[in-house]
Amino acid sequence: MSEQQNAELDFHGEMAVRREKLAALRAKGNAFPNTFRRDALAQDLHNQYDETDGEQLKEKDLHVAVAGRIMTRRTMGKATFITIQDMSGKIQLYVARDNLPEGVYGEDVKSWDLGDIVGIKGTLFKTKTNELTVKAHEVQLLTKALRPLPDKFHGLSDQETRYRQRYLDLISNEESRRTFVIRSKVIAGIREYFIGKGFIEVETPMLQVIPGGAAARPFVTHHNALDIDMYLRIAPELYLKRLVVGGFERVFELNRNFRNEGVSVRHNPEFTMIEYYQAYADYHDLMDNTEELLRKLALDILGTTIVPYGEYEFDFGKPFERITMHDAVIKYGAEKGIVKEDLYDLDRAKAAAAKLGIEIQKSWGLGSIVNAIFEEVAEHHLIQPTFLMAHPAEISPLARRNDENPEVTDRFELFIGGREIGNGFSELNDAEDQAERFDAQVAAKDAGDDEAMFKDDDFVTALEHGLPPTAGEGLGIDRLAMLFANAPSIRDVILFPAMKHKG
């Protein structure tokens, strides 16, 4: 019999024993009580009393009620040391026969298994090894776990299982719990920052008749009552700008977007973003906001502006570099033979792209080719926080043209570690120019560009009522969480990432 078959037999055998224990509990009455009330968390007790010596604890006679999942246990005759884990951390219990009512230790405590959830009332004391411990006087089994934890709870190392059964990952891996606490702090910190700046938080439609605000392939669904196809939103941008037209001059939305595209270490089809819009501001103001926000998050979450990530350390305390797309291509493409003249002539740009092995789509003009060259030769070099600016108008259909060079826009993307983290620009508020750019997007879509934008006539109508000078930005929450948690994959920071169906 193979080792795997033996393991499966042991697993099913242990489940059978646990079910028998549950049946015995049912026979006694309520097998899943809900009367125990906890008054202390493990980490709070450690914070308060780890430095208190044993004699002082004894004098204080501190009574506590703790609850959590059994992580480890070791029995020595008439006493058992148990470690339980709650949302804050772990604490040790000392459960001895002589400290409990008659029969409780032999009938109840000895039947407990790893993974069971228990409630304990007792007093704090220090062991001979000076470990803070709860001496149990009352015990109660709150939930009987029927399935044993992975590898007797020595850890859960299989990556796919960690993603598919996140609850097991959270039980067994402290680092995963820390990651999602950091994610929560990122979201809370962003919300606090914008509310503190006078922005109001809003919610705009997830189901849209016209999916706009970004170049991406949408998910399509059908509304039965209205008998129309609808789309899961790819971005809230066009609705948020309608609100600025309506007089909400500082507005943000922190919510989900959906894009029917590939899955990778950086991409999940369902993801979280903050998008915000500020009237009477331009893209320079938003770059300043972004630097300020990221410094605040770093200090609040890590206590320093130095952010370690993999082999890198990012310094959020320094001003972020600012460089145009053309300058970045010239700077980092020189070793590949790219020269300035290649970026201003369509035929030369096509030839340069071909040398780099870039497959040019029929719908691409000069701007799209320059962008593809940038992605090939320069993007991965933008390691320290860098604002990439002056994107071609062709690939920026919602951004305001630059006053000095209308071929490019007042737009920026934030790159950290060679990855795009955010995208923002001074908004296009010329309704006629916007209509023309939508028409160009429609032509690109007709030519086979699946990610070209749909035309939104109602948005153009809104612009015709007058959008004040405005700038807006979107920041990827998942990628920020990756950054602050030092997580290598986007799946590590999404509680339940998209996975291929297993069956």
UniProtKB/Swiss-Prot annotation:
* Chief location bin: cytoplasm
Query: What does the UniProt cofactor note say?
Result: Binds 3 Mg(2+) ions per subunit.
Which EC main class describes this enzyme? ligase
Please verify whether the record's keywords include Isomerase. Answer: no
Binding site residues for Mg(2+) 2:
420
Where does this protein hold Mg(2+) 1?
Answer: 413, 420
- InterPro entries for this protein: Aa-tRNA-synt_II, aa-tRNA-synth_II, aa-tRNA-synth_II/BPL/LPL, Lys-tRNA-ligase_II, Lys-tRNA-ligase_II_bac/euk, Lys-tRNA-ligase_II_N, Lys-tRNA-synth_II_C, NA-bd_OB-fold
The UniProt entry, under PANTHER family, shows:
LYSINE--TRNA LIGASE, CHLOROPLASTIC_MITOCHONDRIAL, LYSYL-TRNA SYNTHETASE
Family, as annotated: Belongs to the class-II aminoacyl-tRNA synthetase family.
Quaternary state and interactors: Homodimer.
Q: What is this protein called?
A: Lysine--tRNA ligase
Organism the protein comes from: Mannheimia succiniciproducens (strain KCTC 0769BP / MBEL55E)
